[in-house]
Amino acid sequence: SLILNGKQLASIISAEIAQQTAVLAIKPRLAIILVGNNLASEIYIRNKISCAKSLNIETQLIRLPSTATKNNILEIIKSLNEDPTINGIIVQAPLPNKNFQETVFEAIDPRKDVDGFTPANIGRLCNGNRNCLVACTPLGIWKLLSYYNISLSGKHVVILGRSRIVGRPLSILLSQKFEGCNATVTVCNSQTKHLAEIINLFFVLV
């Protein structure tokens, strides 16, 4: 079996992006909305800001208390959607109040939807439309397979997990008629029976 190491590819892509952004008269700007004081979210945001800085991407961190209402957040997103100086928007998940989390994601302009969570981007991906923003981890996996010249056409891929961040969009992506894809995909979850037998059938395990 072959374990793919993404660090080398990540360095190559990062260098290319940094080179492209270095010559821009106006730097790209990423707005990040952080609601509450989730420790894991704080770490993720700190890493994202550090990465953006290394790529010559400016960031605007908007902190909101855990008591922020749906309307509070939607008003900020509306303002960011309309701001021509903002190129990308991230709402760090999970929100303290998950009851309106989907509504918040849906409010982001699909063209600025860095995480690829909006119905417009997910719908385009489902329809095989390459003109969409794809969730970062699935897109990274696709690029990694391409980097290693691995084609999944006709192959069986087993994905462990069906999260909206990785498993679900990845299963859609790898089953499309895109270059290197065209795979037969099995998505397993916590209720999957005979998992060991299924895993034994895989060509690629994610």
PLM features per residue range, with description:
Residues 35-49, 129-206:
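Glycine-rich phosphate/diphosphate-binding loop of Rossmann-like nucleotide-binding domains
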Residues 27-37:
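Short beta-strand segments enriched in small/hydrophobic residues
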Residues 82-87, 201-204:
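Short acidic/histidine-rich motifs immediately flanking catalytic phosphotransfer sites
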Residues 1-26:
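Positively charged, low-complexity intrinsically disordered leader regions
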Residues 88-157:
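Anion-binding alpha/beta catalytic cores of soluble intermediary-metabolism enzymes, centered on
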Residues 2, 54, 81, 108-111, ...:
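Non-catalytic terminal and connector segments of soluble metabolic enzymes
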Residues 52-66, 181-188:
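Short beta-strand elements in bilobed, periplasmic/extracellular small-molecule ligand-binding domains
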Residues 72-84:
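Short, well-structured alpha-helical segments in soluble
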